[in-house]
Swiss-Prot record:
InterPro entries: Ribosomal_bL20, RIBOSOMAL_L20_CS, Ribosomal_protein_bL20_C. SUPFAM superfamilies: Ribosomal protein L20. One of its GO terms (biological process) is ribosomal large subunit assembly. It comes from the Bacteria. Keywords: Ribonucleoprotein, Ribosomal protein, RNA-binding, rRNA-binding. One of its GO terms (molecular function) is structural constituent of ribosome. PROSITE patterns: RIBOSOMAL_L20 (PS00937). GO terms for cellular component: ribonucleoprotein complex; ribosome. CDD domains: Ribosomal_L20. HAMAP family: Ribosomal_bL20 (MF_00382). It comes from Alkaliphilus oremlandii (strain OhILAs) (Clostridium oremlandii (strain OhILAs)). This is Large ribosomal subunit protein bL20. The gene is rplT. The keyword Aminoacyl-tRNA synthetase does not apply. Belongs to the bacterial ribosomal protein bL20 family.
Length: 119
């Protein structure tokens, strides 16, 4: 059986890793081993970051809604409960956008939630 040389394959793999390491500092972008280690670590960070981004945005939306509802005399949790009782099904992203760009419409939603809470 003939011996298989992996020169082309290894070269291709090294080029792929070094391309991913573009922009890293020092040996991490020039030499294969440190570049490979840091590329693997950076891919882990990217994976974790994609999960954290969802949490961060939800936190941001809730903070914005809370600030806007408190300006209208209601807490976030009571506001969300009032919307649920009123049968209004809007996600937090849309509510936070309304709180910023459509203050009158958001105030109407808060009033609707207040009425349903008092009823």
């Amino acid at each position: 059986m003939a011996r298989v040389k992996t020169g082309k394959t290894a070269h291709k793999r090294h080029k792929k890793v070094l391309k991913l390491a573009k922009g890293f500092r020092g040996a991490r972008s020039k030499l294969f081993r440190p570049a490979n280690q840091f590329v693997m670590k950076s891919l882990k960070y990217a994976y974790i970051g994609r999960k954290l981004r969802k949490r961060d945005f939800r936190k941001l939306w809730i903070t914005r809604i809370n600030a806007a509802t408190r300006a209208n005399g209601l807490s976030y949790s009571k506001f969300m409960n009032g919307l649920k009782l009123a049968g209004i099904d809007m996600n937090r992203k849309v509510l936070s956008e309304m709180a910023i760009y459509d203050k009158e419409g958001f105030a109407q939603l808060v009033e609707t939630a207040k009425q349903k809470l008092n009823a």
